[in-house]
């Protein structure tokens, strides 16, 4: 809205002869200083290739082909490269309803029988769950014309076959098809792909017991699978979804501190001070009509109310942890789009130079992490890590790949794996040096990017950003110094130290996927047990995709529904056997 007013004002001034052209007011700007040094994923993490001029470089071994993920929730088990090892909890059914609630083979039992109309639902639930009814009565659904959108519209009327509405259910032609289709346009890192992301190529969702990653599962499933994650049920008030706090549920915390960066920065301060003043923030208006005194999350990332919630830039592959080639055409396109958002309130020159400052900060952080990483890598190569990867319990793949080669395609056996296999950060049961390296890039470096991107420069430097990386670099060097001195002393006096057994086995360690693979599939790795489904490489027609995956499942000896999360009153415990084999 303010951008429109700016253009209108410029046109009026031109008409009055006050200024010459729109371009002289809005386009002319100083060019940002180009940064020469570009640290790309292959340089920081050992990933293959050179700077990618397409701009489609992804971190963690994720590939652009991933975006071909076929969305078909009727397929079972949940489609993903590692779905054979994806462990579930009964509560997941509410976050992934089409897969874990709405199919007959997994639908929870219900003591109530019969079919009911809206009025009957309201009468009963006014006693059983009065809060739901109060919220529903405040909603636009309850007041829809010519007839209310009732309980039976979304949940069905057969109490033995009730459904839990998914985003697909909301996205029908009769309801919110436009919004559903807009959300579906998102690529990697978007709400439209965050659920499948956790199953296709990433290991952290299948490495541990499900209780360990419940928070990961909630935030990586519900935004893709349910509209009610952002649109508070059962009111579904758009005004609530337009407030920045609505994003806070997922977008905060150690390794993705979006909320903290926004909240403590100037933009967040303006929001917090004025958010109850309807003249400054009128959330009853659509985003396309918004005229806020400062930006909300939605104002910048859902331009004009479009449901494809956008990352402003992909130049930093995975939250600032490495940098893609800045000569890429896609980088320029993304940066221009980012500036076009900022210039609703700021001059393009101001926006570009602030973003260039962010670039410098991320570049410096990459240099700092490369130095930190090299200290740890040299300990590994020289064989003085305590313990070495071979002395730990098997990693997620059933091997002993060095944890800091995340997403890397290894150079050989020195890193514990075979050339072409990828690693995964170990956040536990690893050397202190590895854990500090993980926190340096995963917690501190990401926050430098988030802080600079959201106007929280002081926080990006002082609290959990640049100065935090300084501390961890010092700690890694100090630990490395001790390790080398101890190794030299042991060699001098002839001590052959054997690592403690607690690195290899323990009550909790034995529950991890790696030890399970070694015990139950001797000589196999997760790469042998979970070959790439064909749809990771090609865009088959849906029927072909289903046939291909079902054939692969049959070859692996997995039957459809092996991940079923039945939870009947007979006492069956789905957590006890949440996978067919595990």
Swiss-Prot record:
The residues the record assigns to binding heme c 8 are 267, 342, 345-346
Which reaction is recorded as catalysed by this protein? Answer: hydrazine + 4 Fe(III)-[cytochrome c] = N2 + 4 Fe(II)-[cytochrome c] + 4 H(+)
Where heme c 6 binds, per the record, is at 191, 247, 250-251
- Domain of life from the UniProt record: Bacteria
Q: What induces it?
A: Is highly expressed (at protein level).
Stretches of Basic and acidic residues bias are at 567-582
The GO molecular function terms of this record are: heme binding; hydroxylamine oxidoreductase activity; identical protein binding; metal ion binding
Write the record's keywords in alphabetical order, separated by commas. Heme, Iron, Metal-binding, Oxidoreductase, Signal
Query: One Pfam family, short name please?
Result: Multi-haem_cyto
Q: Where does the chain bind heme c 4?
A: 216, 219-220, 462
EC supergroup of this enzyme: oxidoreductase
Q: Which residues take part in binding heme c 5?
A: 227, 230-231, 306
Give the primary localization class: other
The leader peptide range reads 1-32
Q: According to the record, how does the cofactor bind?
A: Binds 8 heme c groups per subunit. One of them, heme-4, is an atypical heme c (unusual heme c binding motif CXXXXCH) and is called P460. Catalysis takes place at heme-4/P460. The other c-type hemes mediate electron transfer to the external electron acceptor, which is a cytochrome c-type protein.
* Location(s) in or outside the cell: Anammoxosome
**Where is region (Disordered) located?**
561-582
Q: Tell me the residue numbers annotated for binding heme c 7.
A: 297, 300-301, 454
* Residues binding heme c 1: 121, 124-125, 159
Annotated residues that bind heme c 2 are located at: 151, 154-155, 234
How is activity regulated here?
Answer: Is strongly and competitively inhibited by NO and hydroxylamine.
Q: Name one GO biological process term.
A: protein homotrimerization
Q: Which InterPro entries does the entry link to?
A: Multihaem_cyt_sf
Q: How does it assemble?
A: Homotrimer; subunits are linked by two covalent bonds between Tyr-462 of one subunit and heme P460 of an adjacent subunit. May form 24-mer of an octamer of trimers.
Function noted in UniProt: Catalyzes the four-electron oxidation of hydrazine to N2. The electrons derived from hydrazine oxidation may be transferred to the quinone pool and exploited to promote the generation of proton-motive force (pmf) across the anammoxosome membrane.
Q: What is this protein called?
A: Hydrazine dehydrogenase
């Amino acid at each position: 809205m303010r951008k429109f007013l700016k253009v209108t004002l410029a046109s009026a001034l031109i008409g009055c002869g006050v200024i010459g052209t729109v371009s002289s007011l809005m386009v002319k700007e100083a060019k940002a200083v180009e940064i020469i040094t570009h640290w790309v994923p292959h340089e920081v993490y050992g990933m293959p290739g050179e700077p990618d001029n397409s701009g489609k470089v992804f971190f963690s071994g994720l590939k652009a082909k991933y975006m071909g993920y076929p969305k078909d929730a009727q397929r079972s088990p949940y489609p993903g490269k590692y779905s054979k090892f994806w462990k579930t909890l009964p509560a997941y059914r509410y976050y992934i309803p089409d897969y874990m609630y709405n199919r007959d083979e997994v639908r929870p039992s219900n003591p109530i029988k019969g079919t009911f109309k809206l009025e009957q639902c309201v009468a009963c639930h006014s006693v059983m769950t009065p809060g739901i009814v109060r919220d529903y009565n405040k909603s636009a659904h309850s007041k829809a014309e010519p007839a209310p959108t009732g309980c039976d519209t979304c949940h069905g009327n057969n109490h033995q076959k009730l459904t839990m509405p998914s985003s697909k259910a909301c996205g029908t032609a009769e309801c919110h098809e436009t919004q559903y289709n807009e959300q579906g346009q998102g690529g990697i890192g978007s709400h439209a792909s965050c659920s499948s992301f956790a199953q296709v190529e990433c290991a952290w969702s299948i490495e541990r017991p499900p209780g360990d990653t419940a928070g990961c599962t909630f935030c990586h499933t519900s935004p893709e699978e349910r509209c009610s994650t952002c649109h508070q049920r059962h009111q579904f008030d758009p005004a609530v979804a337009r407030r920045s706090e609505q994003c806070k549920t997922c977008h905060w915390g150690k390794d993705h501190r979006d909320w903290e960066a926004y909240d403590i920065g100037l933009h967040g301060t303006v929001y917090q001070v004025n958010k109850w003043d309807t003249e400054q923030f009128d959330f009853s208006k659509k985003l396309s009509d918004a005229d806020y005194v400062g930006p909300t999350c939605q104002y910048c990332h859902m331009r004009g109310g479009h449901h494809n919630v956008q990352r402003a830039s992909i130049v930093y592959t995975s939250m600032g942890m490495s940098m893609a080639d800045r000569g890429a055409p896609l980088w320029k396109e993304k940066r221009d789009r980012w500036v076009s958002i900022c210039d609703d309130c700021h001059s393009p020159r101001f926006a570009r130079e602030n973003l260039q400052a962010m670039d410098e900060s991320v570049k410096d952080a990459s240099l700092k992490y490369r130095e930190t990483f090299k200290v740890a890598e040299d300990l590994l190569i020289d064989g003085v890590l305590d313990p070495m990867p071979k002395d730990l319990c098997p990693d997620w793949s059933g091997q002993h790949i060095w944890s800091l080669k995340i997403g890397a395609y290894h150079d050989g056996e020195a890193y514990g794996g075979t050339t072409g296999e990828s690693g995964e950060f170990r956040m536990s049961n690893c050397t202190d040096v590895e854990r500090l390296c993980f926190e340096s890039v995963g917690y501190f470096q990401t926050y430098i990017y988030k802080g600079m991107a959201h106007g929280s420069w002081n926080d990006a430097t002082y609290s959990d950003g640049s100065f935090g990386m300084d501390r961890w670099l010092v700690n890694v060097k100090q630990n490395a110094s001790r390790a080398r001195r101890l190794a030299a002393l042991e060699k001098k006096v002839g001590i052959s130290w054997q690592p403690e057994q607690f690195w290899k086995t323990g009550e909790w360690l034995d529950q991890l996927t790696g030890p399970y693979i070694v015990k139950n599939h001797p000589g196999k790795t997760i790469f042998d047990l979970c070959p790439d489904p064909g749809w990771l490489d090609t865009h088959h027609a849906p029927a072909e995709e289903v046939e291909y995956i079902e054939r692969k499942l049959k070859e692996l000896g997995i039957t459809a529904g092996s991940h079923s999360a039945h939870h009947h009153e007979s006492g069956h415990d789905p957590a006890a056997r949440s996978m067919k084999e595990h």
